[in-house]
Amino acid sequence: YISISDLPQKDVVFIHNDICDTAAVYSALSDYNVNAIFHLAAESHVDRSISSPGSFVKTNILGIFSLLSAAMKYYSGLRGWQRDTFKLVHTSTVEVYGDLDAHDYFTEYAPFRPSSPYSASKASSDHLIRAWFHTYGLPVLTVNCSNIYGPRQLPEKLIPLTIHKALKNEK
């Protein structure tokens, strides 16, 4: 896998902080004079959301409110090309559309039908993102991911599980 430190450009910064700390988020935006935010902070394990929904509400709902508050304050101070090119990219999930039967499909126009605390928290964050776009004009883009893969991913997730089974010649 690739690390940020492997990138030739040094204008990409990874900041490890608490998404619920609005002042810290705003400080990071203004300190680095950003022109895009790629929001990847989330609690994302469906089973854990059932046994411990509070952390999902905190990170995925209160955290997005904190991020939106900081982003709006930052965006309000931008002028010219910086304002014209600024974007907040919000990573969501296909889980917001609910469970599908084997032959069903959905599009981004499908109604939300969350079926777990995780998907409900992500649907809530999607609604907040859209509200900030429509109410305040904050430029946003939501991406609904499914079965993403990366280092340190939990082994029961689809892609690591499939790879593991293939390596063991299992179905």
PLM regions: where:
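C-terminal substrate-binding subdomain of Rossmann-fold SDR/epimerase-dehydratase oxidoreductases
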Residues: V13, N17-C20, P160, A166-K171
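Glycine/proline-rich active-site loop of Rossmann-fold NAD(P)-dependent oxidoreductases
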Residues: A123, I148-L161, K168-K171
